[in-house]
Structure formats: C-alpha cells, structure tokens
C-alpha cells in the first residue's frame, strides 16, 4: 500500500494551540510600546468622526483591584470598538491626585505639616507620593491591554490642570453660583475637615435612643391650647433623639402644623405627644396608665416656650414640614448647627445657629461645665445622666441604626456648622437647569436617570471648601471686616492661575497678596481653604477635555464608571459643567455594578474572597480577564471566582481553536491570486461567508449598544455551532483531499480567509492580545496592527432568491443534527465505529426530499457519511427513527458497502479500478492524478 500523506493538504500553522498568555502578553505589550501602536492608531483614524470617552480619574493611592480592572477594560473595549466602527477615539487616562488619603499616607511617613516638615515641604512629599502611585497603577492598567496615551496622562496635580481648576471656579463665581455661609456640613473629626456627600458611607452604629421632656415655661398657657384647665404636675413637650450630644445646641422644638397633638396625663406630669404616637411612646416608656386630657393642632402651639433641660434658657416651639410620624414623638429637637433641616427651619425663625463643637469633635470651652473638652460621642452617657438628674429623661434604650461614616476612616461623622463656601443649588437656578440637562443625556442602564434626578432634586448646596494642606487653593480674597469677596475676584483668580500654571499650587501659598492686590492688600486676606477633590475631578471636562488638542474641542461623548458615581463624579461633573457652561458635560453615561464573589458576596479581605487582577494575569493572562469582563452583564453585580474565570478560559480555548483551524487551513493561500470569485464558489462556502456577515451585523450592533456579553455569546455561537459543529467539520474532507490548487479547495480557503479577516476584528476589542497574534499569521498584505483597521467589508451572503438560501442551510443543519443523534446512539450501542462507516437513508416527505435531493451526490459530504440517499417517507421501515426537530423525516442507516479508502477514509465500491493507484477510490484518483474533483454544493 502506498503512503499518500504527501498528496493531502494537511493543516499547518505556526500559530500555537496553547495561548500561554501569561508568558506571551508582556512581550506583545513591549512591542506595542516600542512601535508606538497608540500613535499608529491615532494616525490611521485622523480626520474620522470623533468619539470621546473621558476617563474618570481613579485615586492615586494603592494597587488596582478587580473593580478597577472591570472599569478600565470596559472603557478599552468601547474605545477599540469605536475605532473599528470608523471613529477617531483617543483615550487619555487620568488620575485624581489631591486630597486626604494621600495626606494621611504622607503624615504616616513624615508627620503632619508644621511638625517635621513645613506645609510647602509636605506638599512636595504629597506630589512625590502621588506620582509614585500613578506609576504603579499605570503598569497594571497597561498590563490589562488597555491602549491609551500612557506617556501623557492627565493628572489633577499637573500645574496646568491645577490652574484650570482655579479658572473653573472663577467661571462659576462669575455666573453667580458661589455663596458663603455657616451651614451644617458632614464633618469628620479624624480628618478635621468637611466631607462631600460622595465621601460618606453608612454603617450600623449603636446609639442611645432617648425621649426627653422639655417643661413648659407657662404650663397653664400651654394647657389652654388643648382646652384643658385642670391637670396635675408640669406640662412637658417630649422629643426623641439618637444624638444626645447635639442637645447643647438645641434652640427650638419643631412640630408639624397639621398634626394632631394630645396632652396626656401620666403620674405626676402631663406630656405633649403626637396623637398617633401616644401608644408607642407609652409602651417603650413602660407607662401602663394614662389619660388624654385634650387635643390641638401643632400650629396652635407655635412659639410656646419650653425650658431647655440643662442649658439654663428656654426655646420656642416652631413649625416644620420635615416632622414625620414614622418614629419618635412627633416633636423634633432642633439644633440648627447640627442638621440641614434644622438649619433651614432655624433660619426661617431667625434662631441662633449654635455650634459648640470644635474641629476635633470636642465641646468648646464655655459649652457646659460637665461637657467642656469632652468628645461628643463619649459625652452621650454624660448627657443621659444629666437629663436623669434634671428629671427630664422619660426613656433611654440602645438602638442599632445606619449612621453616616467617613469613607476613609470608617468612623462616625457629625453635622457641624462651620463657615464654608458652597455652590448654591438654587441661588441662580442650578438645580432646575441640571434637572433639565439630565433629560438630554442617554443613561445606560436607563434607571440611572431616575437615580441621579432624585439625588439632584434633594441634594443640599455643595460645600466645596476644605481645610486641608494638599489641594487646589480656592484662590479667593475676602475683606477683613465684611468677609465679602474682592470685587475683582475673577480677574484676580486668573492672575493666580497663571502663576499656578508655572509653579503649581505652592504659588498660591508663596504669593504676597500685595503682588496682585496692590493697595487693597491692607484690607483683604487670602482664604486658606482648598477645594473639595470632587471639584478637581468634576471640572476635568473643562480643565482637561476642553484643552487637550487631541479632543479638538469636541467635548465628552461618554462617562463610564461604577454605579456609586451617580452621587460622585457624574454628579460633581454635572454640577460644575452646568454652573460653568449651562450644559451637561456628557452625552451618554454608562454605569457598571460592583464585583462580588461567586456567591454574590461583596469582596472583602476579612472574608478572604478577593481576587487580584495581577494574580489572574500572571496565571491565566490578560485576555482571560478581558473575556470575563465582556461576558458579564455589567449592569448588575459582576460575579468573579476561580470557577467563573475557568469557564472564561474554556470559552477562550474554543475561540482560539477556531482561529487556529482557520489559519492552519489557509496554509499556502495567497489572497491576491488564490481568492475565488463569489459566483464561482461552492454554495456551502458562500453560505459560511454569509453566516459571518450575519454574525458581524449582530456583533457590530451589540458593540454599538455596549452589549458586550451579547458580542461574546454571538461569537461563541458562530465559532461553536455554525462553524465548529457544522461548516468546519464538513469542509475537512474537501480541504484535505481535493487537489491543492483546485476551485473546490480554493473556494473553501477563500471562505476561511474572509471569515478569519472578520473574526479577528470581532475579537480585537475584547481579546486584544490574541487578535494581534492571529493578525500576524493571516496571509496577504496588511497593516501592521488590526487595531488600525475597521470592521471587515469583504463579506457577502447568499441571494435570498437562490434555492439553497440561508433557510435551506438552516434546515440542513437540523437534518444533520438528527442524523448525528442516530449515529451517536449506534456508536454507543457498539453497532458503528466512525460516521464514515455508515450509509444513511433519509425518508422524507416530498417537499423535504426535493430539497435534500438538490445536493445530489454531495449530500453525503454534508452528513459526513460514506453514503446518503433520499427515499419517500412512506417507504420508511419500522426501525427508522423519526426526527425530533425536523418534520416529515425518518432516518435509517446501514454499514457502508465497499472498502475503506486509505487516503480519504470513505467506504466505496470503486477502489482499485485504476491500476496505477490500485488502493485508491475513484475520487482520490481524480484528486491525485487527474484534474481534481468538482464540487458545486458542499
């Protein structure tokens, strides 16, 4: 028997079967950098329509975590897919570099400013530390395969950006949105600074829950409001609070004007309570006997006076719509210095806004002899004892409730009225305008719109001033006596900005006011406050996007961050852009969920369920991480575990194997000379190219809609079902056994070439490393990198009018599936070896039979059997198996007649008819020694 191996077109490629990504990817990154791949993309896309995804800056502190990876990979997928879609989409990564976390790290290393280092030296150390952190994070982001201008990122501590942040505030001032006031703000006693809403987290805290009696100054006068003239003991208005430490600042008691209140006689005293809450108050106070003496509306008690239990003065009853009946007594202890609602109602009544608490959370001297110098939370028990001593404590118990805490220290914070600078929400209609702007933005997912609308509608004025060392200075001058802003503030801020642009923020602290104020310097002082870091990042639409030349003044199309940024970066950016320019800074806002483990639990070092992106890349490679991100519905929680990543690795292998099959069978194919014209191609090959066209249309749409999990699903379906389970199986015989330069083989290679050209582009935004690797093995002249290209435009499909159209092949795919079931069962029963040992008879109704017969002798190649014939359904024997998914079809098989051809492995009766090739079948003789077999359909 002759060895016919050399007459076969066996697959061959240098493209490795194993990805070995963890080892191979770093070398690819090095090549991308050395050859300036990002610059090549910019050159290739120059002049195209712009799409700008503006990078929300991560904080320059610590290593990146899995959530960072999700964020950056999603951005990179969008940027690359937009490039494939014909957009010029530059990506400028950024970092948030000022603020408290960096200060705290530098304090740990060098001490607080003014101790071992001057404030100026401290800022230098902060700048150096932030720069180190940026470099560390940058390496990890690059390792993810994210392409961007990594050599020229934007940093909020860049001198020019710092200057532009000052200019942004100047514009807001000129538009009339800045105000100064002593308002209660979130205050961290550890930071000794105010906090933004986005810097507040909520944790469970145990607090004393107390009911406190404020005795009426004129009990008889108050009782008459209830129509009561006879009562026993003092008359007291009862408040409920979980913050006893705020009682020294109490200046009023708020009642709802429309609620019904009752005067309730208990043993030895009368209590005023909301009618609906009497029973619940009595129950928790352990009072079993009481009598309702009379009722009145809250409005009837307005300005009645009640004695403060321990401060030695009396306070009025005032009316407030913020009072509810959800809990408590229906009377709200009101301290304007310790709560936003209290502040508003106190201002309305012209009450003192008392603030007896210092920056460190301790009572100021002169507050109360027992409390002076005490830390507020430690004073709670002292105040409870004081109330008990004054016979003003009706009830006390411990309550576990959700309480605001500092995002950095995780410690409880307080509301504290301090002189601060605010962006006013209503002074010049900023709230109303922002709500209008929200409507013009596309929110992905849609629920994001309602979420941010609620936040904007209910948010207080934005406190933008901070009492910190490492931050952009507000750069304001105020009059020594009136504390009013200098009338030329905006002009002066531009002078400061010019200096900061040259020398950084230290220029402000080095500035002698006389240098720019002249004679006015005697009457004005520099404001020492720095800006909230959310102002830094929130103004990057102006300080970065508007000034970077590669953006061409286009403005941002998209912001993309985690869902916590509705109250963070999305909010601050919207406020600043609307205050500056009267419009939103973005056209689309996409949010993703947080990462959780396989059981849906939050990632936590204490639980031990964290997954490090660095570990994943070192073990599995960046493309596995990228494929996992793309495979997930990012709009909800994003689950990750070793098992989930293993599934992503399995999916990756299926896609890689498909690509390798394509490349291996393009061996010896030169597109410029070997491509077969569509009209001359085998019908099945044209169908395969048409399936690629349909897949590409779906994939392009999914990319455009940011449905990346749909991209992956469609990619997997194409590779596994349409290609792997059908087309690639069928063509092996023709590809391997046909004459190497025959139309039958070149038609197949033409299809594989078109499919590979499309597939590598579909993969590129997600599996970037592997796409680059595939690109290098594709035949024909081409650009150096797939990332400079657009979606492949060489695909074509079957004409709908053709008899063998898409519907025909879809039906045939089902028929083949039914045949496979029958043959697989026979193999399981040991009645059959390989499918080529079988000859199949398809008993079909007349319409199906006509379609199947149109394939003539080539039906057997589609079914991967040595024989196939079609017979009338009525002739089906009893043992023929009815198809489950194809109507009018029964299947039977028998062992194929003849001998096995050693070259094509088909069983046939025509072996040995040609003496020179006595062991070959007639078909193989034609392919080895003749003109090659002709294929028309498959």
Swiss-Prot record:
<dbReference type="Pfam" id="PF00133">
    <property type="entry name" value="tRNA-synt_1"/>
</dbReference>
<dbReference type="InterPro" id="IPR014729">
    <property type="entry name" value="Rossmann-like_a/b/a_fold"/>
</dbReference>
<keyword id="KW-0479">Metal-binding</keyword>
<feature type="binding site">
    <location>
        <position position="904"/>
    </location>
    <ligand>
        <name>Zn(2+)</name>
    </ligand>
</feature>
<dbReference type="InterPro" id="IPR013155">
    <property type="entry name" value="M/V/L/I-tRNA-synth_anticd-bd"/>
</dbReference>
<dbReference type="InterPro" id="IPR050081">
    <property type="entry name" value="Ile-tRNA_ligase"/>
</dbReference>
<feature type="binding site">
    <location>
        <position position="924"/>
    </location>
    <ligand>
        <name>Zn(2+)</name>
    </ligand>
</feature>
<dbReference type="InterPro" id="IPR033708">
    <property type="entry name" value="Anticodon_Ile_BEm"/>
</dbReference>
<keyword id="KW-0963">Cytoplasm</keyword>
<dbReference type="GO" id="GO:0002161">
    <property type="term" value="F:aminoacyl-tRNA deacylase activity"/>
</dbReference>
<dbReference type="Pfam" id="PF06827">
    <property type="entry name" value="zf-FPG_IleRS"/>
</dbReference>
<keyword id="KW-0030">Aminoacyl-tRNA synthetase</keyword>
<feature type="binding site">
    <location>
        <position position="901"/>
    </location>
    <ligand>
        <name>Zn(2+)</name>
    </ligand>
</feature>
<dbReference type="GO" id="GO:0005524">
    <property type="term" value="F:ATP binding"/>
</dbReference>
<keyword id="KW-0862">Zinc</keyword>
<comment type="subunit">
    <text>Monomer.</text>
</comment>
<keyword id="KW-0547">Nucleotide-binding</keyword>
<dbReference type="InterPro" id="IPR002300">
    <property type="entry name" value="aa-tRNA-synth_Ia"/>
</dbReference>
<dbReference type="InterPro" id="IPR001412">
    <property type="entry name" value="aa-tRNA-synth_I_CS"/>
</dbReference>
<feature type="binding site">
    <location>
        <position position="921"/>
    </location>
    <ligand>
        <name>Zn(2+)</name>
    </ligand>
</feature>
<feature type="binding site">
    <location>
        <position position="605"/>
    </location>
    <ligand>
        <name>ATP</name>
    </ligand>
</feature>
<dbReference type="GO" id="GO:0004822">
    <property type="term" value="F:isoleucine-tRNA ligase activity"/>
</dbReference>
<keyword id="KW-0436">Ligase</keyword>
<keyword id="KW-0648">Protein biosynthesis</keyword>
<feature type="short sequence motif" description="'HIGH' region">
    <location>
        <begin position="58"/>
        <end position="68"/>
    </location>
</feature>
<dbReference type="InterPro" id="IPR010663">
    <property type="entry name" value="Znf_FPG/IleRS"/>
</dbReference>
<comment type="similarity">
    <text>Belongs to the class-I aminoacyl-tRNA synthetase family. IleS type 1 subfamily.</text>
</comment>
<keyword id="KW-0067">ATP-binding</keyword>
<dbReference type="GO" id="GO:0006428">
    <property type="term" value="P:isoleucyl-tRNA aminoacylation"/>
</dbReference>
<dbReference type="InterPro" id="IPR002301">
    <property type="entry name" value="Ile-tRNA-ligase"/>
</dbReference>
<comment type="function">
    <text>Catalyzes the attachment of isoleucine to tRNA(Ile). As IleRS can inadvertently accommodate and process structurally similar amino acids such as valine, to avoid such errors it has two additional distinct tRNA(Ile)-dependent editing activities. One activity is designated as 'pretransfer' editing and involves the hydrolysis of activated Val-AMP. The other activity is designated 'posttransfer' editing and involves deacylation of mischarged Val-tRNA(Ile).</text>
</comment>
<dbReference type="GO" id="GO:0008270">
    <property type="term" value="F:zinc ion binding"/>
</dbReference>
<dbReference type="Pfam" id="PF08264">
    <property type="entry name" value="Anticodon_1"/>
</dbReference>
<dbReference type="InterPro" id="IPR009080">
    <property type="entry name" value="tRNAsynth_Ia_anticodon-bd"/>
</dbReference>
<protein>
    <recommendedName>
        <fullName>Isoleucine--tRNA ligase</fullName>
        <ecNumber>6.1.1.5</ecNumber>
    </recommendedName>
</protein>
<dbReference type="InterPro" id="IPR023585">
    <property type="entry name" value="Ile-tRNA-ligase_type1"/>
</dbReference>
<dbReference type="InterPro" id="IPR009008">
    <property type="entry name" value="Val/Leu/Ile-tRNA-synth_edit"/>
</dbReference>
<feature type="binding site">
    <location>
        <position position="561"/>
    </location>
    <ligand>
        <name>L-isoleucyl-5'-AMP</name>
    </ligand>
</feature>
<dbReference type="GO" id="GO:0000049">
    <property type="term" value="F:tRNA binding"/>
</dbReference>
<dbReference type="GO" id="GO:0005829">
    <property type="term" value="C:cytosol"/>
</dbReference>
<feature type="short sequence motif" description="'KMSKS' region">
    <location>
        <begin position="602"/>
        <end position="606"/>
    </location>
</feature>
